[in-house]
Amino acid sequence: MMRDIHTKKIKKNAFRVTKARGFTASRVRVPGGHLPVKHMATIQKIAEEYGNGTVHLTARQGFEIPGIRYEDMDVVNTLLQPVIEGLDINQPEKGKGYSAAGTRNITACVGNRVCPFACYDTTTFAKRIEKEIFPHDLHFKVALTGCPNDCAKVRMHDFGIIGMTIPQFDASRCVNCGACTRVCKKKSIAALEQVNCRPKRNEEKCIGCGECVLNCPTAAWTRSKEKYYRLTLMGRTGKRNPRLGEDFVKWIDAKSIIKIIVNTYDYVDRYIDRGAPGGKEHIGYIVDRTGFEEFKKWALKDVSLSKNAEVAKTVYWSGIHYE
């Protein structure tokens, strides 16, 4: 039977056009990749009763439920409502599913609720960003990782957020065992050295990983109360020029990161190639075309950076060129 399917409309509603004729797949957003287990029952119900009985865990930490008939999209949207509300996802009209799919699900490592290496709660920050930028049709990818280990591979995204800390030293607790300097040399970048029987931190070299904090047996090193981040830019995969994101701002605060991302939507709306296939153009290619300085002007508009923030004077990307 022939069906009149508006492909752009169903894609915007977070359904995929699949290779199976007459069938689609529902894409479920999970900001920060953390899902209360009660919602698993809803996903299972949709998969078993309206899909093909399987669920795909996506690279962006969401769920994709394949094998859904086009005529069942409305009922699937209705069933997804408790999940959407439970995850506090912005939704202009209840019961209609997701209102956009351009801005991708924000991914994150498990963060400091579980991992001792993480410098902050990645899921909470991911949800905070989600509230500011979704729904939107522009193609943005944001990822968060708790520390410089970068388990979430954030340098492959448009915006990568890496947790940092400024280690605080209490000399009265130090027994000069040398554990911090040894671990910094072996596991990090040797930003500590022993001077007059005390560790001395090279502020220019330190990447804020917190290895010294984790390995000090007397808790002479502690994490800073303030949360800091490294913001990376315009990493990407793809056919033309895959590349890793480069540093934009070091020791930046959360509020400034959100403002920069929001500002970038205005920048993209101004410079995107309207004639690009599907009306989509990767942000990185727009920056390549306009130049970094123009992007920087838009990104930092009305941003009040903290005194510790270090903004890159310029950024150069390389990667692999297939053209």
Residues covered by each model-derived region:
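Short glycine-/aliphatic-rich beta-strand segments at the starts of folded cytosolic domains
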Residues: 4-34, 104-111, 245-247
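Flexible, glycine/charged-enriched surface loops at secondary-structure junctions
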Residues: 52-59, 90-94, 139-141, 191, ...
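A hydrophobic, small-residue-rich beta->alpha segment in the mid-to-C-terminal subdomain
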Residues: 227, 235-275
